[in-house]
Amino acid sequence: MKTLATSAALALGTLLFAPSAHAAAMPLGNYQLLTNRYTTHAWTWAINLCQPDCVDVTATPRPVRMGVEFFGSAHLAGSTYTLVNDAPDGVICWGYTLPAHDVYSWDAVSLAGTVESTFDAGCNGSPGGVNTWTFALERM
């Protein structure tokens, strides 16, 4: 009888405290976005939980006057997070900016990824296109 009770307790403990399927989720906190995209400013991302397969991102430019803060939810599929942002300042031209549709994708463990930026028009009337940059998130 004692063996049965012990086995039941161990089984219950295994169910309650087993690693979840979300073990690949990134740690919450503040990160510096390291990228080859920007030369005029840097970004800080505050990462908070929004649901089991999602994190909320508050992206703040540094210095603040050099970019437009944005908010979004990054969804986890497998081990990859994806965040979509329609950036009013996604294309930086000499003296002005143009909008772009940015898709950030990064690995939940290595925190390295790419941002693909699609834009309808380029600087000085040049045609639209797609640019891809690499980035990494470094915990602050």
Question: Which functions belong to the PLM regions below?
Answer:
Residues 11-14, 41, 103:
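Generic marker of "main functional regions" within proteins
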Residues 25-27, 32-99, 125-140:
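Central antiparallel beta-sheet cores of small beta-barrel/beta-sandwich binding domains
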Residues 4, 75, 107-111:
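N-terminal start-of-chain detector that recognizes signal peptides
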Residues 18-27, 95-96, 101-110:
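Short, surface-exposed loop and linker segments with low hydrophobicity and enrichment for Pro/Ser/Thr
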Residues 12, 24-27, 112-117:
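A short linear-motif detector with a strong N-terminal bias
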Residues 101-121, 137:
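Internal, hydrophobic beta-strand segments that form the core of beta-sheet-rich folds
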Residues 1-23:
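Secretory targeting and sorting signals
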